[in-house]
Design a protein with these regions (language model features):
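Short glycine-rich anion-binding loops that position phosphate/pyrophosphate groups of nucleotides
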Residues: 47-49, 104-106, 213
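Conserved N-proximal alpha/beta basic substrate-recognition cap immediately N-terminal to
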Residues: 6-91
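Generic C-terminal helix-cap and adjacent flexible tail
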Residues: 236-241
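Glycine/Thr-rich phosphate-binding loops of Rossmann-like dinucleotide-binding domains
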Residues: 51-52, 109, 204
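PAS/PAS-like sensory domains
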Residues: 191-194
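ATP-dependent carboxylate/phosphate-activation module, predominantly the ATP-grasp catalytic core
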Residues: 116-117, 121-189, 200, 205-207, ...
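Hydrophobic residue at the +6 position relative to the catalytic HRD Asp in the kinase catalytic loop
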Residues: 196-198
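Active-site nucleotide/adenylate-binding loops and adjacent lid/helix of ATP-dependent enzymes
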Residues: 4-5, 56-59, 63-138, 144, ...
Length: 241
């Protein structure tokens, strides 16, 4: 079986290490988001659920599923989904100040702002109550709904703790309650390889977002886990290769 690995050209350039790991471990070729040819399986590393949907409609196995990508890339829908399933989030449609303003489909913390004034709600943004512990969050990596590792990210200079924005990162030992919460969230959505991000409020984890094209830089920098290798092993197992 031969598959395709889909990245936009810009993201393929930015993620050369990950691309190399995929190509090294699987019989696949790298293509961009315009590819509409044949494949036995697809690894979708774009944030566009329609790409996954296109191949799914042809009966082709896609990692991750389109419905997961659709949910992960619409923060408003994702928060509403979590609330429906009794997963704690920070309140949305928040009218107080300060307020966190997030682009619905934003990534990497680059379109997240802390406002100290009120404004009319803009389309394509989520307005959310800030947590009581800014500049600190937790990312958990899962493969096939199994927890692989967790890393705590902190920033002393910014309410955003993203590693790519200069925050620090250290491995984190999950407690039993945290593991239970993560497993509950993982059980709500079909997924293959994701990150789940949490913020801290009142001393406990609060759901923040799902990353369907989760990066691996922190895992390789801070642990000895070959997470892309593990993901490739999972793909082989799923395809019975």
């Amino acid at each position: 079986m031969s598959g395709i690995l889909i990245y936009t050209k810009a993201e393929a350039e930015r993620n050369q290490f990950a691309v190399h790991k995929f190509l090294q471990n699987l019989d696949i070729k790298l293509v961009d988001e315009t590819y509409m040819g044949n494949a036995d399986f697809v690894i979708n590393r774009t944030n566009d659920y329609k790409i996954a949907q296109y191949f799914e409609e042809q009966g082709i196995r896609v990692f991750n599923p389109s419905e997961l990508s659709r949910l992960a890339n619409d923060k408003q829908k994702c928060y509403e989904f979590m609330m429906e399933h009794n997963i704690e989030i920070m309140p949305i449609n928040y009218t107080g100040i300060p307020v966190v303003k997030k682009k619905i489909d934003g990534h990497g913390g680059t379109e997240v702002m802390m406002l100290n004034h009120t404004e009319a709600f803009e389309d394509n943004y989520v307005y959310q109550k800030p947590c009581d512990t800014p500049g600190k969050d937790l990312r958990v990596w899962l493969i096939g709904r199994k927890i692989i590792t967790a890393i705590l990210r902190e920033s002393k200079t910014d309410f955003r703790s993203n590693f790519c924005l200069g925050g620090s990162a250290i491995p984190y030992q999950l407690n039993d309650n945290e593991i239970c919460l993560i497993k509950k969230i993982a059980g709500l959505v079909e997924s293959d390889y994701i990150g789940i991000d949490f913020i801290f409020n009142n001393g406990r984890l609060v759901f923040n977002e799902i990353e369907d094209t989760v990066g691996a830089r922190m895992v390789y920098d801070k642990t000895d886990i070959d997470i892309i290798g593990l993901y490739c092993d999972y793909i082989k197992s799923e395809l019975e290769l």
